[in-house]
């Protein structure tokens, strides 16, 4: 039997993972449950872990997995677990420096006998994205992957393999595959693919500092980088994440 706060936290974590594949931060959990401090979140997570509802993934900051839900809503969790995480092996496009990412439209695969394949959406893998020091701009599609349709909510999408550890406190790790919705604008606080000086691509949290744009890491080892507005172009916004365990 869960307490009301335990149940609220479990469902908040579950819904966030279902929407984006990324667990909420302790600050987000504290605000969602209207608690005064993060110590209360630590106690609730420990209680949920002891009861077998969640588990903390070892050696990974802020990495949580929902193992089960209360019996009355467990079928929804089972349905969400049909999709198995995988690692995408991307590569940098050659000769494409300084050009913007141009993903192909996401599309449904042809109907077949495999129910999972029919319900999946195929999106292009465009290579690697830096979650650290920016790397050369990504240009060419390497291959495609299939993702659950509820991860794609309209618009054009593409996938990138994460390289680096600057976003670990946002639950994004080296080797993860991020699902990006093509966009050229972002709201403050959103995680974006940013093209810097027409030649370097990086995955960072988007902020505004007066007339300037700040690309903020989610790792205290990395400094926030500030640029003039004409030096940064938003290439897309994070909508999901795929991970191999």
Curated annotation (Swiss-Prot):
Known catalytic reactions: Hydrolysis of Ala-|-Gly bond in repressor LexA
Residue range(s) of DNA binding per entry: 26-46
Keyword Amino-acid biosynthesis assigned: no
GO molecular function (one): DNA binding
Pfam families named among the record's database cross-references: LexA_DNA_bind, Peptidase_S24
UniProt entry keywords in alphabetical sequence: Autocatalytic cleavage, DNA damage, DNA repair, DNA replication, DNA-binding, Hydrolase, Repressor, SOS response, Transcription, Transcription regulation
Site (Cleavage): 131-132
Summary of subunit composition and partner proteins: Homodimer.
Family that this chain belongs to: Belongs to the peptidase S24 family.
UniProt protein name: LexA repressor
Annotated organism of origin: Mesorhizobium japonicum (strain LMG 29417 / CECT 9101 / MAFF 303099)
Gene name of this polypeptide: lexA
